[in-house]
Structures are given as structure tokens and as C-alpha cells.
């Protein structure tokens, strides 16, 4: 029997793209309540007044001349804005919410994933953790302590294609949106939690989700199916 206190909020760009179709088909197997937010691709120069810490020099333009160049673009702002909308949408009720990007795929069987969702919710109900990351950790992730059989206290996660937020902490998330300027979604979450002195729950040893292959709207280049965006661990 499916839980009635869990929902998925998925951030969408192009409902007809192959990677979004694959993602929906994967996530819909879970049988949870489902909300899709269509987040139009940003085509204007990104705002400078609310970039994180006033670092306007990090903004390189509407797009990157070189996809491998570092810098913030309209695509990054649009991605951040999409996550903010998803967070707000998740907080309209008391459901535990999985926020998923448009290309998120399950990497384990459905029942196993549901069991890990239950493990995350049990931690939420017995602790003050505000987020559980269902993405694969990268080589920069550091761990503090083991919290459950599979979840560790950690930080510095790269990529944001699947995470669960705790509805008890609505005010925390609103405060972070109001007080931490925009960045890439993953680094915005990293900064938001670090500056509040908070750790994240991380599935340390498990590869629960991955990203489907396709053209990245942020980098405007084709990306293969992958678990993490950082080189240095097995993809």
C-alpha cells in the first residue's frame, strides 16, 4: 500500500523531451502523489541584485561560450528559480516531498526505493534533519556521523536531481530563500545549510538515482547518463 503522506514535485522544462518522458515513467512507478511544475527556460540576462554575496563577476552571460567554463548563466538562474518554486509548492501541506529534476531516474527497484523513502521519513520524525539527499555523493562530500542503517550526516553534495525535504521546517526554507542569494541549485543548498550550521542526511553508500542522458539546458551541451557531475568518482 502506498503512503499517502509523500508526494513528488518535479521541475519540468520540455514535456516532450525523451529524458523527461523517461524520468516520468521511472518516477511514476512509485505511485506517490505527483505535481509537475513547468519552468520555462530563462533567455534573459540573469539578475545581478540577488546573486549570492553580490558576486556579479561570477555571472558570465546568458550562456557560456564554452560549456566547460565555470560561471553563472541564465540557465543557472532558471534552475535555481525552478527549485525555489518546487520548494514553495512542497510546503503547501504537510507531505514529505521528493523534489526531482526533469531528468531524474531511479537506479534501484521500486520497492527498495520506497524502503529508503521510509528510512528517510523515520529519520525526519525522530530528529531535526531538514533534508535527505537521494543523489549519489561525490568526492567532496564529507561525513560527520552515521544516523541510520544507510543515512549519514554530511555536506557538500553536487547535483540536485532528487532530495526530500522535511515539512516541519517550512520557516527554515523560506528564510533560506529570502536570505541566501541565487547560485546553482546544488551550491545554493550547500551554502544555505552550511551558513545555518545545518548538516544534510546523505545515503553514503548507495546509488539510488541518476540523471538521464540528454541536452543540458544549463550548459547547452549533451550530457551522458550519469550519477554525479563531478569527476573523481565512478560515474
Roles of regions detected by a PLM:
Residues 1-100, 104-235:
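An acidic/histidine-cluster motif and surrounding catalytic segment
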Amino acid at each position: 500500500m502506498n503512503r499517502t503522506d509523500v508526494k513528488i514535485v518535479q521541475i519540468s522544462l520540455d514535456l516532450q523531451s525523451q529524458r523527461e518522458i523517461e524520468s516520468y515513467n521511472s518516477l511514476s512507478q512509485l505511485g506517490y502523489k505527483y505535481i509537475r511544475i513547468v519552468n520555462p527556460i530563462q533567455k534573459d540576462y540573469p539578475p545581478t541584485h540577488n546573486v549570492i554575496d553580490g558576486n556579479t563577476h561570477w555571472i558570465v552571460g546568458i550562456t557560456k561560450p564554452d560549456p566547460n567554463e565555470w560561471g553563472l548563466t541564465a540557465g543557472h538562474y532558471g534552475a535555481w528559480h525552478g527549485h525555489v518554486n518546487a520548494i514553495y509548492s512542497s510546503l503547501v501541506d504537510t507531505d514529505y516531498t521528493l523534489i526531482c529534476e526533469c531528468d531524474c531516474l531511479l537506479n534501484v527497484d521500486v520497492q527498495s526505493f520506497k524502503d529508503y523513502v521510509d528510512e528517510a521519513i523515520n529519520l525526519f520524525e525522530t530528529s531535526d534533519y531538514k533534508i535527505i539527499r537521494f543523489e549519489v555523493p561525490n568526492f567532496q562530500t564529507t561525513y560527520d556521523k552515521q544516523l541510520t542503517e544507510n543515512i549519514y550526516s554530511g555536506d557538500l553534495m553536487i547535483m540536485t536531481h532528487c532530495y526530500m525535504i522535511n515539512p516541519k521546517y517550512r520557516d527554515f526554507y523560506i528564510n533560506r530563500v529570502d536570505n541566501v542569494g541565487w547560485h546553482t541549485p546544488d551550491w545554493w543548498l550547500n551554502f544555505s545549510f552550511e551558513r545555518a550550521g545545518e548538516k544534510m542526511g546523505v545515503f553514503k553508500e548507495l546509488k539510488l538515482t541518476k540523471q538521464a542522458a540528454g541536452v543540458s539546458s544549463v550548459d547547452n551541451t549533451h550530457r551522458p547518463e550519469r550519477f554525479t557531475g563531478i569527476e573523481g568518482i565512478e560515474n
